[in-house]
Amino acid sequence: MRHCDSFCELIPMKGCEAMLEWMIDQGAGREPADIVLKGGRFLDLITGELVESDIAICEDRIVGTFGTYRGKHEIDVSGRIVVPGFIDTHLHIESSQVTPHEFDRCVLPQGVTTAICDPHEIANVLGAEGIRFFLDSALETVMDIRVQLSSCVPATHMETSGVELLIDDLLPFADHPKVIGLAEFMNFPGVLAKDPECMAKLRAFQGRHIDGHAPLLRGLDLNGYIAAGIRTEHEATNAEEALEKLRKGMYVLVREGSVSKDLKALMPIITERHAQFLALCTDDRNPLDIADQGHLDYLIRTAIAGGVEPLAIYRAASVSAARAFGLFDRGLVAPGQRADLVVVDSLEGCHAEIVLSAGRVVSEALFAARKPVAEVGRNSVKAPRVTASNFRSQSNSGKTRAIGIVPGKIITQNLEFDLKVGPNGVEPDLERDVVKVAVIERHGKNGNIATGFVHGFGLKAGAIASTVSHDSHNICVVGASDEDIATAANRLGEIEGGFVVVRDGKVLAEMPLPIAGLMSTEPYETVREALRKLRHAAEDLGSVLEEPFLQLAFIALPVIPHLKITDRGLVDVDKFEFVGN
């Protein structure tokens, strides 16, 4: 089902003129509106008032407020509050482990009417084909999915990705109606060093929206980064960092995902004064957390429960988000605005009871009417088969670096342990929560295998493995034994990628992700329950992490401080160089 992003788009001029006349007549009350929400109140994000009024809708637009209207179809919203649809300003749909169509069905009923996604997960595996898949899907979804073109594929050259996207690969998509601009520019060292390819991308998108990604970047270096035309940023993990970015003119996107949980730390800056320069995002959130907690509705509830003024958080969730990304047709309950509306039980509860997307009441019938999009990225896992011997350390020294997991953060610690050296090299120390980590190149490029150690998973036995491993999505495995690490890695090749939990050579739980090794072909309900089983299986191995698989997914991302591992080895992100074990 293809619908218009503006009421004139793709409509013959004569039809557009007629629609414009209908909107005027319905807004002026001369004709019954297509839909009228009656009996409730709406939140005016300009004044902060709760206004008792009908809301009249013609086609995909709000045409009337502050009045009484007749409607061809009237919906009683007595005792409830109408707010603008929520906008997720930065996310990777692939991290939900479902296709864009299933993501649409999963989160739109919870009030997320616009999602601004960066498809760089699938782009790292499939390149332009992956971006095209997302753009084709975005034309068919009920919610408005907008796409930022992936700016850093791969994130760095310290890992092996499936492809490399240069500026000439991105430009053919630049004028697509669903494209806003350039996605998170993760290679901030490249920006500051004026790397030629970085400069080519930045120059090509000057005047368009360029999203940022600059964890812990401060001072004059931050100034230089912003001066490149970068407007928004979602990596602030404390109020001090966020305030510096706000003071320097950036929009700060407050993030709360399944692993990166920054909302609590940033609550002090979510005020009515700052709200016009704030927005909300999830970055990476899986269907299990969406089902158990919610999506942006969860962020809103949590913020208000933590003392944030409702007006501030609702502004950040809609109108401020829309303005930050140039979507001036939405974000308010006002005439002329896109009819993206959420009927909630209360501002504090923020439980969506009715959702309208572009003037259509969201229902299973709407989802069923969508045109399907052909699958891509099958059989993308081309890793070599491995044995336990591939993961044995050759070092004679027990003094070893280890990646330190910080629960709820994707930043890691650069730790050092003195470990026992046995007949098969340096051994894990389960008493001190130090186990092995391995990254295996899976794109059929070179068969690289890198091993190291990690602290903080809590594993006492077995292994967990994934092909969701930002950003190049090689196989990443954490385990207490070399044999189980090998079994888990090999199983991922057999199921076209996904998640696996292994103990004593047996698979305890798994979830295939055959679309590029990132997304399931199943409904989100099936994915949700598979994730629940995987999480329980990981807990049975001793995992102490709330979200072990997404935590695992960021171990190999060498643009997030401090110590990471790619298929090429351990990376000291602060120095941006490889280091020995």
Swiss-Prot record:
GO molecular function: adenine deaminase activity
Short name of one Pfam family: Adenine_deam_C
Keyword Kinase assigned: no
Matching InterPro entries: Adenine_deam, Adenine_deam_C, Amidohydro-rel, Metal-dep_hydrolase_composite, Metal_Hydrolase
Keyword entries, A-Z: Hydrolase, Manganese
Enzyme class: hydrolase
Enzymatic reactions: adenine + H2O + H(+) = hypoxanthine + NH4(+)
GO biological process: adenine catabolic process
Cofactor needs: Mn(2+)
Keyword Electron transport: no
Alphabetical list of Gene3D superfamilies matching this protein: Metal-dependent hydrolases (3.20.20.140), Urease, subunit C, domain 1 (2.30.40.10)
EC number(s) given by UniProt: 3.5.4.2
Family matches, as HAMAP family: Adenine_deamin
Record-stated family: Belongs to the metallo-dependent hydrolases superfamily. Adenine deaminase family.
Protein name in UniProt: Adenine deaminase
Organism: Brucella suis biovar 1 (strain 1330)
Name of the gene this protein is made from: ade
